[in-house]
């Protein structure tokens, strides 16, 4: 049995977890930074300072809750990219320091791969499987062939889906982060009132574009008085639009996988936007695949997914040097 202490500091969550190869989460700690809410978005310098301030205490708490000590660890892991470079440096250097002192391996984890592989902590998902990764920084279709081996089928040509949610929320006068607020207000809205553009829909391939939707919402905000009901209707119409785009793109992704002679049994939807229950229900209803979502708390950034990915990497004997440098940009599959 292997046990890993994992650190996640790629954006505005400071998180630590201890996970073992028996799929047990022995401890998990997470601190969400609230400072960014009043500023309308994540301020990188503030985020990295908060990581420096809180990371040590979260590690201490995790060790105590797990009833282990550092000598019981088989490795340390940290999200080392992609993400905000300041936070990546804080987390990576801390994990390296523990690895050096304990003379145990250090594993640099790709944040995107952690989102993809966490599903294998929860379910018996075998490679290959289809992935829709929708988060604050990324929006792409992948075929996960193995640990460290991925085929990218399509991606956003402009904003990520998470960015689109946040920018639309800002136009509507909602606070950051926008996704949960849009979902909440949409429940009181009419999703058929506004016909927003379904960009790329019915086109071949499975790339995305969300810039036209943002422009359409901006025009609505300028045209309407934006009563409380107007805001709710825009939120509902926006979510309805996004769901139709995703459904169209999923069908194309399956066709592309089949053209590569890859049989897909499982379809995994992951990343922060996968926490949206409206989108979950739409995909479950209309997609004829075994569709799997991580629980809400493992869709958003967390260290459990980093720890489990570290376990998967360790089992493949992919060990990183202590000279590994954090990568603010890091494509999947590029070890």
From Swiss-Prot:
SUPFAM superfamilies: Actin-like ATPase domain. The keyword Cytoplasm applies. Fe cation binds at residues 111, 115, 301. GO terms for biological process: tRNA threonylcarbamoyladenosine modification. GO terms for molecular function: iron ion binding; N(6)-L-threonylcarbamoyladenine synthase activity. This is tRNA N6-adenosine threonylcarbamoyltransferase. It comes from Wolbachia sp. subsp. Brugia malayi (strain TRS). The lineage of its organism: Bacteria, Pseudomonadati, Pseudomonadota, Alphaproteobacteria, Rickettsiales. Its main location: cytoplasm. Belongs to the KAE1 / TsaD family.
């Amino acid at each position: 049995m292997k046990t890993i202490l994992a650190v996640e500091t790629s954006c505005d969550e400071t998180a630590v977890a201890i996970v073992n190869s028996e799929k047990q989460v022995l401890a998990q700690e997470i601190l969400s930074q609230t400072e960014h809410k009043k500023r309308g978005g994540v301020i990188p310098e503030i985020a990295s300072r908060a990581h420096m301030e809180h990371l040590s205490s979260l590690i201490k708490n995790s060790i105590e809750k797990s009833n282990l000590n550092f000598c019981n660890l088989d490795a340390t892991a940290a999200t080392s990219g992609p993400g905000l470079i300041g936070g990546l440096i804080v987390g990576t250097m801390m994990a390296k320091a523990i690895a050096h002192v304990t003379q145990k391996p250090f594993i640099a984890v790709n944040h995107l791969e952690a989102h993809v592989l966490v599903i294998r902590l929860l379910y018996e998902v075998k490679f290959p499987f289809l992935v829709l990764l929708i988060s604050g920084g990324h929006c792409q279709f992948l075929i996960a062939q193995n640990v460290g081996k991925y085929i990218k089928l399509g991606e956003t040509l402009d904003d990520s889906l998470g960015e689109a949610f946040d920018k639309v929320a800002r136009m509507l006068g909602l606070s950051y982060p926008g996704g949960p607020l849009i979902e909440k207000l949409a429940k009181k809205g009419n999703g058929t009132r506004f016909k927003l553009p379904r960009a790329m829909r019915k086109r071949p391939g499975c790339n995305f574009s969300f810039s036209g939707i943002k422009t359409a919402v901006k025009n609505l905000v300028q045209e309407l008085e934006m009563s409380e009901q107007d805001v709710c209707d825009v939120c509902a119409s926006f979510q309805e639009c996004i769901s139709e785009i995703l459904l169209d793109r999923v069908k194309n992704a399956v066709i592309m996988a089949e053209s590569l002679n890859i049989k897909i049994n499982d379809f995994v939807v992951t990343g922060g936007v996968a926490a949206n229950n409206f989108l979950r229900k739409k995909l479950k209803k209309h997609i004829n695949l075994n569709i799997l979502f991580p629980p809400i708390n493992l869709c958003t950034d967390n260290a459990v997914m980093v720890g489990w990915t570290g376990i998967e990497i360790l089992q493949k004997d992919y060990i990183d040097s202590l000279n590994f440098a954090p990568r603010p940009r890091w494509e999947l599959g590029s070890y």
